[in-house]
Amino acid sequence: MQVLQLWLTTLISLVVAVQGLHFDIAASTDPEQVCIRDFVTEGQLVVADIHSDGSVGDGQKLNLFVRDSVGNEYRRKRDFAGDVRVAFTAPSSTAFDVCFENQAQYRGRSLSRAIELDIESGAEARDWNKISANEKLKPIEVELRRVEEITDEIVDELTYLKNREERLRDTNESTNRRVRNFSILVIIVLSSLGVWQVNYLKNYFKTKHII
């Protein structure tokens, strides 16, 4: 148990220490989407803060799309610059993508936008300042509660992965049984067909007085 607590504490420290992403997206007249993928569990709050340099009308149109792997779209914003915040609650455990598309309005110009992306989910996405004010919590109480919620989320994630592994193993075993049963059925059918062909040829030769 102490080992698990130490592991969780270390993982929490790594999660908290993660900073936002910084990258550039070159403008193109035929742009391809650049996507950042993350995973979220059912019921988790997700908050994505996006900042782009430049300005609208600077010769490039930066488009934003936020959607998950099951087809839900949470935000679509075209030709934006500056700050955008996207918040949603995941309806199911799935991966989601934050995608950017930078379209150049003119050919022959080398343009790009610098993007800053910060994605937080679960306990990290909650407004702890507001919670502290509403519930009149001390700073240490807020921090302990935040760490507790992060720990619960990690335990839930580990439980989900364990259950998923069990489902995949059951599916694999079921598939193996079906393949084995199908192979046995094929052998029986082929053997029966062989016996029938032998009897048919034997009767045919007898009627022709060949044997």
Swiss-Prot record:
<keyword id="KW-0732">Signal</keyword>
<keyword id="KW-0812">Transmembrane</keyword>
<keyword id="KW-0931">ER-Golgi transport</keyword>
<feature type="topological domain" description="Cytoplasmic">
    <location>
        <begin position="202"/>
        <end position="211"/>
    </location>
</feature>
<dbReference type="GO" id="GO:0030134">
    <property type="term" value="C:COPII-coated ER to Golgi transport vesicle"/>
</dbReference>
<dbReference type="GO" id="GO:0005783">
    <property type="term" value="C:endoplasmic reticulum"/>
</dbReference>
<comment type="subunit">
    <text>Associates with EMP24, ERP1 and ERP2.</text>
</comment>
<keyword id="KW-0333">Golgi apparatus</keyword>
<comment type="similarity">
    <text>Belongs to the EMP24/GP25L family.</text>
</comment>
<feature type="domain" description="GOLD">
    <location>
        <begin position="33"/>
        <end position="121"/>
    </location>
</feature>
<dbReference type="Pfam" id="PF01105">
    <property type="entry name" value="EMP24_GP25L"/>
</dbReference>
<dbReference type="GO" id="GO:0005793">
    <property type="term" value="C:endoplasmic reticulum-Golgi intermediate compartment"/>
</dbReference>
<dbReference type="InterPro" id="IPR009038">
    <property type="entry name" value="GOLD_dom"/>
</dbReference>
<dbReference type="InterPro" id="IPR015720">
    <property type="entry name" value="Emp24-like"/>
</dbReference>
<feature type="transmembrane region" description="Helical">
    <location>
        <begin position="181"/>
        <end position="201"/>
    </location>
</feature>
<feature type="signal peptide">
    <location>
        <begin position="1"/>
        <end position="20"/>
    </location>
</feature>
<keyword id="KW-0256">Endoplasmic reticulum</keyword>
<keyword id="KW-0813">Transport</keyword>
<dbReference type="GO" id="GO:0005798">
    <property type="term" value="C:Golgi-associated vesicle"/>
</dbReference>
<dbReference type="GO" id="GO:0006886">
    <property type="term" value="P:intracellular protein transport"/>
</dbReference>
<feature type="topological domain" description="Lumenal">
    <location>
        <begin position="21"/>
        <end position="180"/>
    </location>
</feature>
<keyword id="KW-1133">Transmembrane helix</keyword>
<keyword id="KW-0653">Protein transport</keyword>
<keyword id="KW-0472">Membrane</keyword>
<dbReference type="GO" id="GO:0005789">
    <property type="term" value="C:endoplasmic reticulum membrane"/>
</dbReference>
<dbReference type="GO" id="GO:0006888">
    <property type="term" value="P:endoplasmic reticulum to Golgi vesicle-mediated transport"/>
</dbReference>
<dbReference type="GO" id="GO:0007030">
    <property type="term" value="P:Golgi organization"/>
</dbReference>
<dbReference type="GO" id="GO:0005794">
    <property type="term" value="C:Golgi apparatus"/>
</dbReference>
<dbReference type="GO" id="GO:0000139">
    <property type="term" value="C:Golgi membrane"/>
</dbReference>
<dbReference type="GO" id="GO:0006900">
    <property type="term" value="P:vesicle budding from membrane"/>
</dbReference>
<comment type="function">
    <text>Constituent of COPII-coated endoplasmic reticulum-derived transport vesicles. Required for efficient transport of a subset of secretory proteins to the Golgi. Possesses a C-terminal dilysine motif that interacts with COPI coat subunits. Facilitates retrograde transport from the Golgi to the endoplasmic reticulum.</text>
</comment>
<dbReference type="GO" id="GO:0000324">
    <property type="term" value="C:fungal-type vacuole"/>
</dbReference>
<protein>
    <recommendedName>
        <fullName>Endoplasmic reticulum vesicle protein 25</fullName>
    </recommendedName>
</protein>
